[in-house]
Amino acid sequence: MVVSLAGRDLLCLQDYTAEEIWTILETAKMFKIWQKIGKPHRLLEGKTLAMIFQKPSTRTRVSFEVAMAHLGGHALYLNAQDLQLRRGETIADTARVLSRYVDAIMARVYDHKDVEDLAKYATVPVINGLSDFSHPCQALADYMTIWEKKGTIKGVKVVYVGDGNNVAHSLMIAGTKLGADVVVATPEGYEPDEKVIKWAEQNAAESGGSFELLHDPVKAVKDADVIYTDVWASMGQEAEAEERRKIFRPFQVNKDLVKHAKPDYMFMHCLPAHRGEEVTDDVIDSPNSVVWDQAENRLHAQKAVLALVMGGIKF
């Protein structure tokens, strides 16, 4: 079966089949090899990506800009000051106007509804660079990394420890679609969205994977192949940071916790890391840590998304 993603939005990975996700991962792997051997892949010559940033980012901005450059296209950075949204122009009108100038839109937003509205009114593909609900590009890079290092995704025990946030949501969705055994451990009251839990359970039933939600990090990481964490307070939650530090302290990924995982476990973090909070130096800097490979794979995974949805490559 030929899979074409041309013209598709990428808002949430629940909208994609396992086959479509694998198409992205396989394309990303191909681009990574091509880059390593110096093979040109300027598949988006003359195309432009508008990048809307309501919130700043190192990895998202740099990886998307470099991805478009490698693909022969151009990335246009637009922050809140560059747009008329603050002066009353609607997201719908912004989407309509940008669609007349560019070939795709990537948006990093606070509210997931903003990226949904962009997609509703844009006539070009819209890519979610991060919202408060999901972070699909991160999950694609994460599972690309797991596939590279473990040789498979099916049956791999992926344990997320911390806040049931956007990163957890996308990790749950993609992992259960691809047949992983996904476990999420959070403090009570900080669980993932109920809707995402149901999706994960349904996905696992279809893929042969599994999903489990726990409140005990030690029990969760037992025999883990992958331990993943993220910051305890996301951007916009600064007022809660002190309270969250107290609540999440027992969920810190440290040398005592990782003893319960498999000896060859992988430590993952979407970065930036708050060292000494959600993870200690002796874990993130250990030989088990793959965070830098994971960060690099954002470039390759997003390059695949761009080439596929902007019509540069078809399978």
From Swiss-Prot:
Recorded catalytic activity of this chain's protein: carbamoyl phosphate + L-ornithine = L-citrulline + phosphate + H(+)
Coiled-coil residues: none
GO BP term, pick one: citrulline biosynthetic process
Pfam families according to UniProt: OTCace, OTCace_N
E.C. number: 2.1.3.3
Outcome of substituting M30A: Increased dissociation of dodecamers into trimers
pH behavior: Optimum pH is 6.5 (at 55 degrees Celsius).
Localisation per UniProt entry: Cytoplasm
Effect recorded for W22A: Decreased heat stability
Pathway: Amino-acid biosynthesis; L-arginine biosynthesis; L-arginine from L-ornithine and carbamoyl phosphate: step 1/3
GO CC list: cytoplasm
One Gene Ontology molecular-function label: ornithine carbamoyltransferase activity
Temperature and activity: Extreme thermal stability. It maintains about 50% of its activity after heat treatment for 60 minutes at 100 degrees Celsius.
PROSITE patterns, A to Z: CARBAMOYLTRANSFERASE
Superkingdom of the organism of origin: Archaea
Domain remark from Swiss-Prot or TrEMBL: The monomer folds into two domains of similar size. The N-terminal domain is the carbamoylphosphate-binding domain; ornithine binds to the C-terminal domain.
Subunit: Homododecamer (tetramer of trimers).
HAMAP family (UniProt xref): OTCase (MF_01109)
Function: Reversibly catalyzes the transfer of the carbamoyl group from carbamoyl phosphate (CP) to the N(epsilon) atom of ornithine (ORN) to produce L-citrulline, which is a substrate for argininosuccinate synthetase, the enzyme involved in the final step in arginine biosynthesis.
NCBIfam families noted in UniProt: orni_carb_tr, PRK00779.1
Note: It interacts physically with carbamoyl-phosphate synthetase (CKase), forming a channeling cluster for carbamoyl phosphate. This prevents the thermodenaturation of carbamoyl phosphate, an extremely thermolabile and potentially toxic metabolic intermediate.
Family to which the UniProt record says this protein belongs: Belongs to the aspartate/ornithine carbamoyltransferase superfamily. OTCase family.
UniProt name for this protein: Ornithine carbamoyltransferase, anabolic
Native species: Pyrococcus furiosus (strain ATCC 43587 / DSM 3638 / JCM 8422 / Vc1)
Lineage of producing organism: Archaea, Methanobacteriati, Methanobacteriota, Thermococci, Thermococcales
